[in-house]
Amino acid sequence: YSSAASDVYKRQVVVNPVFDKIRESGFTEYHFEPFTETLKRYGSSHEGVFEMWKQGINAGIFHPQFHGREHLNVKKWLRNLREDVGFTRQAFDLGTFGLTQDVDPNLRRNYMGAFNSALPEDMAYYDNLLREGLDLFEQLFGYRSESFIATTYTWHPNLEKSLKRYGVKYLQGMVVQKIPLDDDTTFTTKKTNYCGWKSAEGLTYVTRNCYYEPSQYKEDWVADCLNRIAIAFFWNKPVVISMHRLNVIGSLDKDNRTTNLASLGTMLHEAVKRWPDVEFMSSDELGWIIES
């Protein structure tokens, strides 16, 4: 690849928990809704958000791909809700599950890893979860997602059988993959998911190698990204940029959106200036090129 940068995709989970129904079940049943229904409860400030997403997709600004049905370890969350572990109930009452050990020392691990088990019964659950999630993704966006990135970069290789069955061809993530050995207790690591290599199931790795996360860490992200791009292009490799959406959200803090979008623009303009033949594409497009 003389010059290629993949940074116009957006990773998307497609459902959120329905907290009232879960509470009514005594925390024994999991209920969820499409994220488009959740958006409706944000009020007038979020009217038309999904329509704007569609406009962005049609204009080629971004191209959503599948990240999971939900960004949540459902089994662990429900169990801890029933057992009233730590601050889990208090967070639930506020409509969230986003706890960390910094907030709640009682948590051995947060709830964000949706695929943190290797148990056979959980693999069967994940199979159904992936089928539902990928089908709903297609209903919402009008196309099938051919790439996938596991939440928290954690999944068991057996999960790839289900991903392949339901149409996924490309696995995005880091070079290092975290692999569960039991039920969210013991993990090992695989450190060879190099871009262009294939998994045991024949899925192609599209590996992240550049990061833009100014809302989380105060660094010179423009300089860091440009340096990583230069290294990748020197070795004739594509650039896959990781950036969470929180970096450009402005509903709670407008400066967060304004400042970080300007910084992102600076980085992209400088990249085009330094490498005039650079091409921007989505992760599934990059996967197609690698395969061809």
Model-derived regions: residue spans:
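C-terminal domain-boundary segment and adjacent tail
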Residues: 165-188, 238-292
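Single conserved hydrophobic/aromatic residue that forms the stacking wall/gate
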Residues: 1-5, 9
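Short loop/turn segments at strand-loop or loop-helix junctions that form parts
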Residues: 13-21, 66-71, 208-209, 236-249
